[in-house]
């Protein structure tokens, strides 16, 4: 017979822990009695009002008096004497000692007896309440006044700075409360702000590079720029800021801002730089341009010019100077062959003392020619390396004659090369302008002259192009508007007085509507072509239109007219012919009949 498997698991495989769970059973659940549900709910006791401290003190005093009276009455009734009271006091002291001993045992075991009844808990204030608001306000304060680096002396006086910071914040709050809010439509435009700032800004050239690297040199420059200001002027005149531009830095591997912070300037390229100085008022800027141009500061002549209204360039007072050095400290590389037959490159400086092109032109032409108004050395905008020529403009035309005599001369060490000095030509007499004029006469326009000149009719503009008339206000800001505001914004500002600009298609449609309204004959003249000239029928004249049927005016006299008229009505020659003969014959016959 085969073995049969039973449903009961073997005893060896039973887990004793699981078997212990089912060893004892509570039994089936018993239903609750009906009386449990029929009983009324217990009423909630109203909480007694919490008495104040004064009321509690008065109530405690009254309770003590009542209890003392009751104790005396009870003692007198029962007959307890002083001896009994002493025994009772001893018993109480013994019970207190026992309670203290039990309490120490409980504390050692770490068990605290629970009090009977529910314990009332007071709601504690949350320490992290309003945490987000505090964090955001702290971030706002950090954004308004970023913390800078503190020195040891500043750390010692930290409390004083905190108090000053709090006072300053209060002052700012009071000022902001006094300020009247302005609607965004009435707020000044960004372009207008730039123009207003340009009126207060002056341009400086041939500034010493020491002003970039040395703090004392920068202070000397600022002091010199503020030396001509009027101290009694209202509003007060002062120098607000200065910024340096077109500086030759040592390397192009890092941004210009980082190179400026590290003071890594390459004086071998050029010892001069440009700067912009912002004054508090336009009057101060005009005063600086009139009195500080050509003055000496940091052992260099500086050129001071207005940004909003730059000085005009007059070719009659300018000379062209060529054959100048490209960099101030030139190094010549010579390749030689040594004894072993190898090529060796030797570095040799052209001059022992480095040249200084821009300052040399100021000094030489100011001494030999006359008073110099400006010196413009043409350089590469990125590397600041010179292109070998410059323009010198004098205050007087007669100084040009003296400057031409310097042609072919050297002035070491600043100008060690032979100078090539010549007169400046008028813009329309330059080779480029003459070439463009010839191409225009032949019917071809060079690629560089095809684009229009900001709405002005130039060599590349067509006669049919619409050129709006520029207002006087737009002309005043057209000096350096593109450099200040950009091409797009400058065109908007210059053409701001025009509400709408019309192109060729718009003008063609307007002419068509006007011709249709006036009843002009478009069939005879043919369809209009955009950009073509207007036909005589499209012109609308005031008054009566002249025509050949109106006859001869009374005040019009022809050249061949005779003074003595013939007796006939025509006033001219007598008619001859068959018709005239018949008419005369008919007249004679008619008179005879009568």
Curated annotation (Swiss-Prot):
Matches recorded under InterPro entries: Nucleotide-bd_a/b_plait_sf, RBD_domain_sf, RRM2_Nop12p-like, RRM_dom
Comp. bias regions, Polar residues: 508-524
UniProt KW keywords: Nucleus, Repeat, Ribosome biogenesis, RNA-binding, rRNA processing
Residue spans of biased composition, Basic and acidic residues class: 111-135, 146-171, 498-507, 542-558
Keyword RNA-binding tagged: yes
Organism superkingdom: Eukaryota
Domain RRM, residue spans: 200-309, 317-426
GO biological process: maturation of LSU-rRNA from tricistronic rRNA transcript (SSU-rRNA, 5.8S rRNA, LSU-rRNA)
Subcellular location: Nucleus, Nucleolus
Record-linked Pfam families: RRM_1 (PF00076)
Start-end of Acidic residues biased regions: 57-99
Positions of region (Disordered): 1-190, 440-468, 498-594
Bias-annotated ranges (Basic residues): 584-594
GO cellular component, as recorded: nucleolus
Molecular function in Gene Ontology: RNA binding
Protein's job: Involved in pre-25S rRNA processing.
Family: Belongs to the RRM RBM34 family.
Name of this protein: Nucleolar protein 12
